[in-house]
A protein has these predicted regions:
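Alpha-helical, largely C-terminal catalytic domains
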Residues: 1-192
Length: 192
C-alpha cells in the first residue's frame, strides 16, 4: 500500500497559527516550520562559531522541520489554552505523542527509524534548547511583522516570547537577537 506520510505532511499549509489573535497576515504551520528550521540551523552555527559548540547545524534544521508535525493531527493549540493548567498541558503532550506515533506509522518500515527519530527525537536532548529557541524566535518575528503593520494585537505576545527566550539563557539566541532581529523591523527598501 502507498504511504500517506508525505501527503499528510503537505497539509501543514492548511493549519493556521495564532488562532486567537487578529492577524493582518495568517501564518500557517508550513511557513513557521521553514522559518524555525532556518533559525535553528543559524543558532547552532552561532553556537559553534562563538561558543565552541559541537552540534550539527543541518541536524538541527531537520529536527526543526519536523518539530510541529504532530499538529497536523492535533491542530495548533493556542498557547494560553495549551498551558492553562498542568493537567491540560499533560493531556496535550500525550495527544502530541500519540499523533507523532500515528504519523510515524504511516512511514514505510525502512524509513520509520530515521524520519521517526526527527518526529519523536528521544535522543536529541542537546538540540532541544536550540529548536525551542528557534520556535520562539519565529514567533517573535511574526509579532514584529504584525506590529510593523500597526497591529497592536501582538505586542504582549512579543514581550512574552522575548521574556521566555531570555530566560532560556541560550547565548546563541542572544547573539541572534542582537545581530539579526533588528532587520525584521526594516522595510523592503531599507533591506535593499
Amino acid at each position: 500500500m502507498a504511504s500517506k506520510f508525505f501527503a499528510i505532511l503537505s497539509r501543514l499549509k492548511y493549519i493556521n497559527r495564532w488562532a486567537l489573535m487578529r492577524n493582518t497576515h495568517n501564518e500557517n504551520l508550513s511557513e513557521h516550520t521553514l522559518d524555525t528550521a532556518y533559525i535553528a540551523q543559524a543558532l547552532v552555527i552561532i553556537d559553534k562559531n562563538h561558543f565552541g559548540g559541537k552540534l550539527n547545524p543541518e541536524h538541527a534544521a531537520v529536527l526543526a522541520m519536523y518539530h510541529d508535525v504532530s499538529e497536523i493531527l492535533t491542530g495548533d493549540m493556542p498557547t494560553p489554552v495549551k498551558y492553562f493548567n498542568a493537567d491540560l498541558k499533560k493531556a496535550y503532550k500525550a495527544a502530541e505523542k500519540s499523533a507523532s506515533e500515528k504519523l510515524i506509522n504511516h512511514l514505510p518500515d525502512d524509513m520509520k527509524i530515521e524520519i521517526g527519530g526527527y518526529i519523536d527525537p528521544v535522543c536529541d536532548d542537546e538540540y532541544m534548547p536550540f529548536i525551542k529557541a528557534a520556535d520562539r524566535l519565529s514567533a517573535i518575528i511574526k509579532c514584529i511583522e504584525e506590529r510593523k503593520t500597526g497591529n497592536r494585537e501582538f505586542i504582549a505576545a512579543e514581550e512574552t516570547q522575548m521574556k521566555a527566550i531570555k530566560e532560556m539563557n541560550l547565548p546563541a539566541a542572544n547573539v541572534f537577537i542582537e545581530e539579526f532581529l533588528p532587520a525584521y523591523s526594516l522595510s523592503l527598501d531599507e533591506l535593499n
